[in-house]
Structures are given as structure tokens and as C-alpha cells.
């Protein structure tokens, strides 16, 4: 598995696979072919069908600014290897000089055709939760300590930057009003949720309202193209920070404890990314929001100092009860149902932790098993339910 630096990516929304990934591919291509007088980018599959809503073309235009570049949306050519496929071509005096096919595999990660893995080195020797948990038990260490062992002590400075970026997104989100870009005329709601408490509000209502306000804040910032952290993707970036932000003052958790929780969450996200997928275009929203919920649950369980079995159960439950969740964004925008879904998943994460605290000893489903199940389920989903905006709510909304 790769470093958590490639899971927690600091960047701008609205989509890790449809903006951050293509931008990374374009920058890489330009480094390899800087002297062409004409470029062409051809988007296929989900990149073509929802690229306009995700502002893929706008993001690419920024990379190729000052150069002659044509962007083509090819919605007909099938994409067998990965639904997020793109070709970039370089021409000189009308002749093709270089052509590379890239796949945006989720979370801002891209690989070129023929590459078995990304260019990033694998630093984790173990690839399953079962192996990692056995290792940690033998050494009598917690999951975050295994992360530190593999990543080195310098990873804490990066995680500090991750946490600061998450908090900044929350702060901007709960202070900003207005309509989100894209044509849906969707009103920002985070500020309202944060400020509009009920008279004689119960503790339970306050808990849910604040968690949702924080999740909305980050997700709305993402939809507006603001700076966020993929956790594990842009579309699911609100869940982990919402849970951490809510819990920190509840028990006066220190920054060090929050960073350890984020390290624990990264292990969950990395295992899913390595053994399955975090891409909505590949496996539906279960791969994005399900993973985010599992990461948040694991992080919260670490804050509460639950044992490894309880952490595993909280993460497993979070995926299990998102199985089959479709990715059908209306008009290809990371707005409906994405923003609201982040809030629901944040609340679910805490529910999973509470249940795991009591029932971990009697569980029957393991984390590795549910990850495999999620991947199989995602592959079985019809393509119209995998970030193409051709089915589900996206279709019904268009027909209405």
C-alpha cells in the first residue's frame, strides 16, 4: 500500500476523479511533451458523461492555459479497463508526436496505460486488515502506531496540515451563504444548520445538527471548488472532518489524539483503495461514501480508545450498510445527493462506533470480507448507476 499522502490529498474540488485526476494527468503529459504546438484531450466514459458538471474541461483549460488545446467529450466509445478514461495527444506541425491514455482511478490518483501500479512506492508490507491486526497484537501496538512505523515520524507534520485544511474548510463553509455554481440553484445550508438551533433543543438534536453542519460546510466548499482534503475522495470529503470536528470539544481531545485518529482512518481507506476501489465511477457511491463512513467510524473508535476488534467492526459495519449505494449525481454535479449524503454518513459513523462498543465480540463479518463484497457489488452495478448521470435520481430529475 502507498503512503497516506496519496489518500489524503489537499486540493480543490469538486471531484477528485474528474478534476484532480485529469489535472494530474495533464501536468504529467505536459512535462513529457512540453514543446508541441497543439494538444487534444479526449474524455471517455464517466469523464465524458459527467465532465461538464464536474468542470473537468475548465480544470484542464487551466493546465493548458496559453496553449492550443481542444477538449473532446466522447460519450460513445466504450471504456473497458476503467470508466474514467482519457487520451492526451500532442501535435507538432499537424503530426501526432505523442499520445498517452490515462485512467483516473479515484481519489485524485491516475495511472497511464500499461502501468500496473502508480508511480508511488508501496511502503506498507501488509495488505489486509487481518494481517495488520495480527501484527499489531503481537507487537502490542495500536493501528496508528503501525502507520507511524511504516510512514516515519515525519508523517505527523503532513497529518497536521491535513487537519488544518479540514478545519479551514469547515470554518469557511459555516460562514458562507449563497447559491452553488452549476445551474441547480442549490442554496448553501451549512451556515443555517450551524446557527439555527431550536428552542429547548435536545442534546441529540444538537449533536445531529452540528455534525451535519460541519459535513455540509466541507461538502459545499468542495462543490464550490474550494480547498479540501480527499477523505477518501472529493465527493465524500465532508464525513471524516465533520466527525472529528464534532468530537474534539466533546471530550477535549488534543490535536495529537485527532492526528492519531486520522492515521487510523487512513489505514482503513488505504486498504479499501488497495483491495477494492474508492471510485464512484468504478463501484458506485458505496465506494466513496461507504469508505468515508468507515474511515470516520475507525477514527472515532480510536479517539474513544476502543480495541482493534471494535475498530474493525465499526469500519466493517459502515461499509456493510452502504452496500449497493448508487452514484447518480444530478446533472453530473457533486451536489445532489452528494452533499446531504456526507451528513447522513457522518451520523451513521457515530452510530456504528456506539454499536461496535457493545457487540464486537459477537460479530460474524470481517472487514476484509466486506471490502471484497463491496468490490464485487460495485462491479455488478449497471453502468448507469456508476457516475454517468444516466440512471436513478439523475434520470428522474431530468425527466421531471
Model-assigned labels for residue ranges:
Residues 4-9, 23-47, 53-54, 82-84, ...:
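Non-transmembrane, aqueous-exposed alpha-helical and coiled segments at domain scale
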Residues 8-26, 224-243, 285-293:
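Conserved phosphate/anionic-ligand binding catalytic regions in large, soluble enzymes, centered on
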Residues 9-11, 279-284, 329-338:
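Short beta-alpha connecting loops at secondary-structure transitions
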Residues 19-32, 241-252, 297-305:
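Alpha-helical support elements that line or immediately flank enzyme active sites
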Residues 63, 69-201:
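C-terminal regulatory domains involved in ligand/effector binding and gene-expression control
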Residues 167-252, 256-271, 277-284, 392-400:
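Accessory "access/gating" subregions that flank catalytic or transport cores
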Residues 213, 217, 238-248, 263-271, ...:
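Contiguous, well-ordered alpha-helical segments that form the cores/surfaces of helical PPI scaffolds
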Residues 300-400:
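Functionally critical mobile loop/hinge segments
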